[in-house]
Amino acid sequence: MVVMRAKDLLGRSGEALAADFLENQGMRIVDRNWRCPDGEIDIVAIDGDTLVVAEVKTRKSLDYGHPFEAVDAAKLARLHRLSSSWCRQHQLNAPRRRIDVVSVIDNGVVEPQLEHLRGVC
């Protein structure tokens, strides 16, 4: 039996909330938790004619800073490279791509708070 750590459970829950949120914004989710040797993409979606790679950051509180603060230039560069790898693996020519970040704050008591930054890179 595999037991997930609380941090991992929170992250999975946040990713599910983010996927639902993005679908409600009109996006079509085409992949989740895609992995390759260079890293992982949380969510891949289509928004009109644009391929969207969404990074999801989930926290219980703001005690250690806003989730957006965890996405630095190195992470954005990695996501850009990963988006190219995803397109190669899926034999998809996606001239229009963007990277979005979704912040989820879920303390388990009140309704989770989601924020969405479009086109951060």
Curated annotation (Swiss-Prot):
Q: Which Gene3D superfamilies match?
A: 3.40.1350.10
Query: What taxonomic classification does the UniProt entry list for its organism?
Result: Bacteria, Bacillati, Actinomycetota, Actinomycetes, Micrococcales
SUPFAM superfamilies, alphabetically?
Restriction endonuclease-like
Annotated source species: Paenarthrobacter aurescens (strain TC1)
Q: What is the protein named? A: UPF0102 protein AAur_2443
Q: Which PANTHER family does this chain map to? A: UPF0102 PROTEIN YRAN
- What family is this? Belongs to the UPF0102 family.
Q: Name one matching Pfam family.
A: UPF0102
Show the CDD domains listed in the entry: PoNe_Nuclease
| Stored HAMAP family | UPF0102
GO molecular-function terms, A-Z: nucleic acid binding
